[in-house]
Amino acid sequence: MTTSGVRVRIAPSPTGEPHVGTAYIALFNYLFAKKHGGEFILRIEDTDATRSTLEYEQKVLEALRWTGLTWSEGPDVGGPYGPYRQSERKPMYWPYAEELLEKGHAFRCFCTPERLEQMREAQRAAGKPPKYDGLCLHLKAEEVTTRVAAGEANVVRMKIPTEGSCDFHDGVYGDVSIPWDSVDMQVLIKADGMPTYHMANVIDDHLMKITHVARGEEWLASVPKHILLYRYFGWDQPTFMHLSLMRNADKSKLSKRKNPTSISYYSALGYLPEALMNFLGLFFIQIAEGEELLTMEELAAKFDPEALSKAGAIFDIQKLDWLNGRWLREKLTPEDFIARTLEWAMENSRLTEGLKLAQSRISKLGELPNLAGFLVSSDVGLTPASFAGLKSKPEEIHEILTTVAADLEKMPDWNVEAIEAELRDIAERTGKKLRVVTPPLFVAVSGSSRSLPLFDSMALLGRSVVRQRLKVAIAVVATMVGSGS
């Protein structure tokens, strides 16, 4: 690279709830920078205009700040290589696309989405992996000029060698060889003028003088495209390190369908950020049994990027619980414990707003734990008996809960008004009265049929906690359906 000193980055996309996988990759980069006396940079990759939102960007920033990580450059703190949002860098990318077109390293593609889908279907039917077939690769310059001038929609694709392989060294996987004929002619500039991840990623890493790219192993297959772009532009490429994905205990990819994956979920349930980062940091170091309790400074001191394994990092919630318990007992003084508990209870106004809702529903303060305790509880203790008092049969309860769980995932906003509107829409679509839809949800989110107002409660708990409680409720009710309860 053309810079002295190590520079690494974390580049999340603000398209959903901040994932623990983001914290995992961010921590590796942070520790790598600490180890080498380098710089840790935050960049927001919001080229997906249809899914990226400022609300999710704010959630990403809040979640990463909560973990205790700090960055020297980013959209919130600025820096010499900004802007640090890709959407604000859009004018920078087109000149590079023009350079690739002029040098013959890229071409314009006029294929419609319908034509591309037909192509993919035919390839799948033939048992071939879907990739662009090169229809527009050899269009004459005059035809391209005419169609562009006429305003015909097009994208810019990169050219790929047809023979040989891309050979490179990865900091985790060692020497890797990927045949060029397996690499797609990647879209670099979309029809709306925005760059794809691959184009923006390479250009931004170069302009921001990133020396080491550490990211998830799912990007390993994309390295040939990135290396090719570095070659086309005549730039030195960074060192690549592809980290093993975090996995469930059954070795499946960590996903919200099996385990809570949102950083906000762990914050809401009262996990200490130090404990979560301690837990994630153990994937990057080698220690003896009994030495697991480590601060960020101790993790940095023991961090050894040369000792990384290709084996999947198992996200064991039981181990996280054990580690968090040790932090609470061994790392906090009684005064710290009280202060952190109060800080957690007041987080996002969950407790204060909950108390306001409870005020008109109690006759004495001693009723508060039963009425509002679910707002600060990690588990509401659902059993088949929890749903036994409802008028709906288990089959209908199961249908309601699964429908609500699926629809809530699609909601762009999470607030009282949006939740109420969504549940009313579900009731209308399913032909049910709202008073039939809401009782199972009362039980699912609070553990009781008598609780605080449902829409307010769901808003206060947050999407990630509601998601997990619905998942547990669906599993409980499924046993009732199977047993004929």
Swiss-Prot record:
InterPro entries hit by this protein: aa-tRNA-synth_I_cd-bd (IPR045462), aa-tRNA-synth_I_codon-bd_sub2 (IPR020751), aa-tRNA-synth_I_CS (IPR001412), aa_tRNA-synth_I_cd-bd_sf (IPR008925), Glu-tRNA-ligase_bac/mito (IPR004527), Glu/Gln-tRNA-synth (IPR000924), Glu/Gln-tRNA-synth_Ib_cat-dom (IPR020058), GluQ/Sye (IPR049940)
Sequence motif 'KMSKS' region, location on chain: 253-257
Binding site for ATP: K256
Record keywords, A-Z: Aminoacyl-tRNA synthetase, ATP-binding, Cytoplasm, Ligase, Metal-binding, Nucleotide-binding, Protein biosynthesis, Zinc
Entry keyword annotation includes Transcription: no
Subunit structure: Monomer.
Family in the record: Belongs to the class-I aminoacyl-tRNA synthetase family. Glutamate--tRNA ligase type 1 subfamily.
Protein's name in the database: Glutamate--tRNA ligase
Species the sequence originates in: Agrobacterium fabrum (strain C58 / ATCC 33970)
High-level lineage: Bacteria, Pseudomonadati, Pseudomonadota, Alphaproteobacteria, Hyphomicrobiales
